């Protein structure tokens, strides 16, 4: 067995579910799990400073390989001393492989055994990304946790296509492992794919587990499938993954999905959802979603969430934040973004306490009722 730079320590398993309380040890510090990771696409979490992220309890953030490769370039970031120094963040960083962005943003994709040729979304230039190149970029970035290059097939793709895709993704994972230049200080995760097909998810997981990655990601979810379909995939995928390694569900940030994935044994999550909806004035609160731009809040001098102790809620009113957003003032977006990130990071803190107290199912029921999920199952 390899001595990996990323280690998982299980502290407690909840009595009634598969939920795990633990911590992940990285070269840039240790963070508790389950954990929600804010997304810093362009080496910044939109409108937030590193100090604010630490203040809210983010022990790790995510950055995007594809975007940083295109701009400003991974070699420039390496010259700066790596991503941590470049963005002045001294805690853990996870980078994705660039695969999802190639499939979702780029034009004219052509997938072969070698990799993917595509036109980049900034200037239309033809580019090529292979498993080896994705690893090389991430080695230059110097993230603590890296992702294997994978194909992310759509959830409802035909079985035969998905089968070929996961087999290629497994071969790509092995190529990425062989290309990894910094296994002593960067942990590379394998990504389980397989759309909604149980046998293909199991095959993908078996292939990757045999390669002894320091952690495993579950990809290809939160791409249009229903909440129940996501839970079903987790039900048959998570048990295939080792108990002594971290489990990361990619691209998931809706509160109900976070809680239900924790119940099934997932440790890490990321999503642009909290900052994206914040820019439109949509706020997550303990009583459900609140669209602070709405006219009814024009003279509402209460906090976004009376039960929240974040900087935004302790200092500013709905009326003021609404005014800022209506006037296109950046400070308004800073305040709503901070609040939403704080909400999800601290939801995970509350979930960790519920695991410690062995009452996660009761916590889930109470949260769902207060948040309004009975009326609308995808009420972000």
From Swiss-Prot:
It catalyses: 7-aminomethyl-7-carbaguanine + guanosine(34) in tRNA = 7-aminomethyl-7-carbaguanosine(34) in tRNA + guanine. Keywords: Glycosyltransferase, Metal-binding, Queuosine biosynthesis, Transferase, tRNA processing, Zinc. It is an enzyme of class 2 (transferase). Binds 1 zinc ion per subunit. One of its GO terms (molecular function) is metal ion binding. One of its GO terms (cellular component) is cytosol. It holds the Pfam family TGT. The active site is at residues 96, 270. SUPFAM superfamilies: tRNA-guanine transglycosylase. The keyword Signal does not apply. Substrate binds at residues 96-100, 150, 193, 220. Its EC number is 2.4.2.29. InterPro entries: ArchSynthase1/Queuine_TRR, TGT, TGT-like_sf, tRNA_ribo_trans-like. The keyword Transferase applies. Belongs to the queuine tRNA-ribosyltransferase family. Homodimer. Within each dimer, one monomer is responsible for RNA recognition and catalysis, while the other monomer binds to the replacement base PreQ1. HAMAP family: Q_tRNA_Tgt. Catalyzes the base-exchange of a guanine (G) residue with the queuine precursor 7-aminomethyl-7-deazaguanine (PreQ1) at position 34 (anticodon wobble position) in tRNAs with GU(N) anticodons (tRNA-Asp, -Asn, -His and -Tyr). Catalysis occurs through a double-displacement mechanism. The nucleophile active site attacks the C1' of nucleotide 34 to detach the guanine base from the RNA, forming a covalent enzyme-RNA intermediate. The proton acceptor active site deprotonates the incoming PreQ1, allowing a nucleophilic attack on the C1' of the ribose to form the product. This is Queuine tRNA-ribosyltransferase.
